[in-house]
């Protein structure tokens, strides 16, 4: 017998590899996900709180880890599995392989982190020609042979690696020959014939017979689940979702209960709340006379869960009660799989339900208002990526496209998507890599499609319901999906989709409304969403908890306004160079300045640029009224402002004003060309070589600040000098800026408060931060350049080798996306420590791309930064990450 249920299973489970569970008793509990996987831990938990769970056992993730290391069944494990099997047989009064009292098993995977459709499942294990005859005697021939043919298909595909399509061809051919549409119309005699054909597939595909010994079937199935951990699709899913550090998958072996025993049986999947909208109402699907995989795999399009009320009222009432118990117990929205066998309800699985961004925020806010959780728990419940989804665009005018709707499916994952039609996952990835937006159109998706699904802007399937593979994966990613669109027929071979009287080809534009299920012909305009309602309330809780300020990188008044609307507490980086590209007049003046050989000529060009800069700064100060604005002086190499193309084209363009001869221009271009421009003539080196450039920018800032102050706008300008490597560089630029300030203030007969600070992006600057802090009133880490110079990776060329580094495990993440805490992070720690030793009130922030990446934000909060600055659209994500690090 298994040990009785206990709540501290982890402490007593040292060395244990096989864990039992059944109603009212279990070896494990919900805290043991690392060891039992999410599925196994939750089965143990459901059993121990008294829900009807078919008895079974879980083989631990550590056993999988041992198998991966040895590439063989670990010593003694098979004996432990057989002992657990004997316990299950005793509980059920049935025996694996006994025709008189047949026990059938399911074998499922389950890692610590849910990976929908990534791992392999085998149902009805234990059937062979003898056992099926005994099962037929007890439960009817049709049920028995339907179970047998399903098992042959699944076992062949999952364990023996026989393509599912070979089995599908046989059943489709039989239905066509008999003039039938549905599998359920096949008779017992038809199914017997199909079983014979399926067994022949084994011989044709593998050159060997189907293994009829049930214990051999179990042995092979356990190994197949272990092997599925390293399958290409599982690796790809983990890579896309940045899932690392797991030991492997657990194996859950459970006695089968049957939803395909007639009209008093069925199977379903539900969420305790709507995962798309968060509405507090059971949301799910149900199939009468079916097995669980039929719902999840999208093989049959199921009915709404509400239909169960009428056909199975008692199991439905028990199910509703179980959902209340589970939500109250886990304090979470739960995803539940269940089966009804001859009017008896069985709970097969529960896990925390995947949800959209909209659903996540509403569920969190509602659960606080219901008194189920507190605000801090609500903040932990919403993931940064959920906010990313909520900030996705919607259609500008949903009412205007009514006449363009060509089909309607199920609204499987909300949001809007616009793209060109592709029919394969590979094409979706290839087109996406070329910068194209695509809609992946499939009859149904499978786990092999995850790469293409991730690359696509949206997904459209002809078959499958709200809990099909496509729907679950798309919702997890916040990707728009319309599923079960029966009005379309997909022809993969011809690369066309038929919709009513229309034939749509690869490359045609399609728009999807994942909130309504509408499929719209053509390319509709999209508009950004807003922070309001539940999201506004949730973000106010976030701001109560976080200590780290969140600013935005914004170069235009429009960007600044977006940042402010998204809750930014200032501008942490305004890149002045972007302003020079916004009109032909500006870029011409900039090129005139670059081509100038004398201070006088350069000053003429700078005088032309001054009003443009001043105007832009005024707009940004106005948008950020009352909040600080950090302006970085010119940073990029000057050659970036020259026309693109070959030298002859450049010369022709630059000489069109007849100011310089072609020879003079050619000489100047040659002088500006650099072998390694990112480490060359840029940043403060420009301002030191051309002090008049720094002077013009400082003057524009101060004049704009005074102008706005006179109009009643509260202005807090902060001037940031880029690429500082020595205190002498900063001292020279500070002198220029202060001299300009005095002149502007004298002319205007007024003064304003301002700060001068330094970018810390050269590793040397981090190491001598105490010397730089003597002159700088604030630091801002430019983590893009700091990463580039610390690793010695050119950001422009890293794509040539980074994919290899990631695939070989040399790097775990792209260091330009996820901040390197160990190496570059050490420089940040040193700079903060030394800088504050010299200037205790030193304000320190970061303004690289890492400012909006959640794990990076958590690190910056821990090392004592005052703020992070990120793109305007990532501000809410950074705010949430900054709050979560405090919990």
From Swiss-Prot:
One Gene Ontology CC term in the entry: cytoplasm
Main location: cytoplasm
Keywords, ordered alphabetically: ATP-binding, Cytoplasm, Kinase, Magnesium, Metal-binding, Nucleotide-binding, Phosphoprotein, Pyruvate, Transferase
Binding site for substrate: 575, 632, 761, 782-785
Binding, Mg(2+): 761, 785
Active site per UniProt: 469 (tele-phosphohistidine intermediate), 847 (proton donor)
Location(s) in or outside the cell: Cytoplasm
Modified residues (Phosphothreonine): 467
PROSITE patterns xref list: PEP_ENZYMES_2 (PS00742), PEP_ENZYMES_PHOS_SITE (PS00370)
Catalytic activity of the protein: pyruvate + phosphate + ATP = phosphoenolpyruvate + AMP + diphosphate + H(+)
GO molecular function: ATP binding; kinase activity; metal ion binding; pyruvate, phosphate dikinase activity
Required cofactor names: Mg(2+)
Family: Belongs to the PEP-utilizing enzyme family.
Extra remark beyond the main annotation: This gene codes only for the short cytoplasmic isoform of PPDK.
Function: Formation of phosphoenolpyruvate.
Protein name: Pyruvate, phosphate dikinase 2
């Amino acid at each position: 017998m298994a040990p009785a249920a206990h709540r501290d299973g982890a402490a007593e489970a040292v060395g244990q590899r096989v864990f039992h569970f059944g109603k009212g008793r279990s070896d494990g509990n919900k805290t043991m996900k690392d060891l039992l996987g999410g599925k196994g831990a939750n089965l143990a938990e459901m059993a121990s709180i008294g829900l009807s769970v078919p008895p079974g056992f879980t083989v631990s993730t550590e056993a999988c880890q041992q198998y991966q290391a040895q590439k063989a069944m670990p010593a003694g494990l098979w004996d432990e599995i057989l002992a657990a099997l004997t316990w299950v047989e005793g509980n059920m009064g049935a025996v694996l392989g006994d025709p008189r009292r047949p026990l059938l098993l399911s074998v499922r995977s389950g890692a610590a982190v849910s990976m929908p459709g990534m791992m392999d499942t085998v149902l009805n294990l234990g059937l062979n020609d003898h056992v099926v005859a005994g099962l037929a005697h007890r439960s009817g021939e049709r049920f028995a042979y339907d179970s047998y043919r399903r098992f042959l298909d699944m076992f062949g595909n999952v364990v023996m690696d026989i393509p599912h399509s070979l089995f599908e061809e046989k059943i489709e051919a039989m239905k066509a020959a008999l003039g039938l549409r549905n599998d359920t119309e096949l008779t017992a005699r038809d199914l017997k014939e199909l079983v014979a054909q399926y067994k022949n597939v084994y011989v044709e595909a593998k050159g060997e017979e189907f293994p009829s010994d049930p214990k051999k079937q179990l042995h092979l199935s356990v190994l197949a689940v272990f092997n599925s951990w390293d399958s290409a699709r599982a690796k790809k899913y983990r890579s896309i979702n940045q899932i690392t550090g797991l030991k492997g998958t657990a194996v859950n072996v459970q006695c089968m209960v049957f939803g395909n025993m007639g009209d008093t049986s069925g199977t379903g999947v539900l969420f305790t709340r709507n995962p798309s909208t968060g509405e507090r109402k059971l949301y799910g699907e149900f199939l009468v006379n079916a097995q669980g995989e039929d719902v999840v795999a999208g093989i049959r399009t199921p009915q709404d869960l509400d239909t169960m009320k009428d056909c199975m009222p008692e199991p439905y009432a028990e199910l509703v009660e179980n959902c209340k118990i589970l939500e109250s117990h886990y304090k979470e929205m739960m995803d539940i799989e269940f089966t009804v066998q001859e009017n008896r309800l069985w709970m097969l699985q529960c896990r925390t339900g995947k949800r959209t961004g909209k659903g996540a925020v509403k569920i969190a806010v509602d659960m606080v208002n219901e008194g189920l959780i507190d605000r801090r728990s609500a903040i932990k419940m919403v993931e940064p990526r959920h906010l990313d989804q909520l900030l996705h665009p919607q259609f500008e005018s949903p009412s205007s496209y009514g006449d363009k709707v060509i089909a309607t499916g199920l609204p499987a994952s909300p949001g809007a998507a616009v793209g060109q039609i592709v029919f394969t996952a590979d094409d979706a990835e290839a087109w996406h890599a070329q910068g194209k937006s695509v809609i992946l159109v499939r009859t149904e998706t499978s786990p092999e499609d995850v790469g293409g699904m991730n690359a696509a802007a949206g997904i459209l399937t002809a078959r499958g319901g709200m809990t099909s593979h496509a729907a679950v994966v798309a919702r997890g990613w916040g990707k728009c999906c319309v599923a079960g669109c029966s009005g379309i027929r997909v022809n993969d071979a011809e690369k066309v989709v038929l919709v009513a009287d229309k034939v749509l080809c690869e490359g045609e534009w399609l728009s999807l409304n994942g909130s309504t299920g509408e499929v719209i012909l053509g390319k509709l305009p999209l508009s950004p969403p807003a922070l309001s309602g539940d999201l506004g309330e949730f973000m106010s809780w976030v701001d109560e908890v976080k200590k780290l300020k969140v600013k935005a990188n914004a170069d235009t008044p429009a960007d600044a306004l977006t940042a402010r609307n998204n809750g930014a507490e200032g501008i942490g980086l305004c890149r002045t160079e972007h302003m020079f590209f916004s009109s032909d007049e500006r870029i011409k003046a900039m090129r005139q300045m670059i081509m100038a050989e004398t201070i006088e000529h350069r000053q003429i060009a700078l005088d032309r640029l001054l009003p443009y800069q001043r105007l832009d700064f005024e707009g940004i100060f106005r948008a950020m009224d009352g909040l600080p604005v950090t302006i970085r002086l010119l940073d990029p190499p000057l050659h970036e402002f020259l026309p693109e193309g070959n030298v002859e084209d450049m010369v022709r363009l630059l000489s069109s004003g007849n100011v310089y001869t072609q020879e003079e221009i050619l000489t100047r271009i040659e002088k500006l060309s650099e072998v390694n421009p990112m480490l060359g003539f840029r940043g403060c080196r420009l301002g030191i070589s051309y002090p008049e450039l720094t002077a013009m920018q400082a003057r524009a800032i101060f004049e704009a600040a005074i102008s706005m102050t006179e109009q009643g706008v509260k202005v807090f300008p902060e001037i940031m000098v880029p690429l500082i490597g020595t205190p002498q560089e900063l001292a020279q630029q500070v002198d220029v800026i202060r001299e300009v300030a005095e002149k502007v203030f004298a002319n205007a007969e007024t003064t304003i408060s301002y700060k001068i600070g330094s970018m810390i992006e050269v590793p040397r600057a981090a190491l001598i931060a105490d010397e730089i802090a003597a002159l700088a009133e604030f630091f801002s880490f430019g983590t893009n350049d700091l990463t580039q110079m610390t690793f010695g990776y050119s950001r422009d060329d890293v794509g040539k080798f980074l994919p290899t580094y990631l695939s070989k495990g040399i790097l775990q993440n792209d260091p330009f996306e996820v901040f390197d805490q160990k190496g570059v992070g050490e420089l940040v720690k040193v700079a903060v420590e030394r800088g504050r030793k010299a200037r205790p009130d030193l304000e320190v922030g970061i303004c690289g791309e890492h400012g909006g990446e959640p794990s990076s934000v958590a690190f910056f909060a821990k090392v004592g930064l005052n703020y992070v600055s990120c793109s305007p659209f990532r501000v809410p994500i950074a705010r949430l990450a900054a709050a979560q690090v405090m919990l």
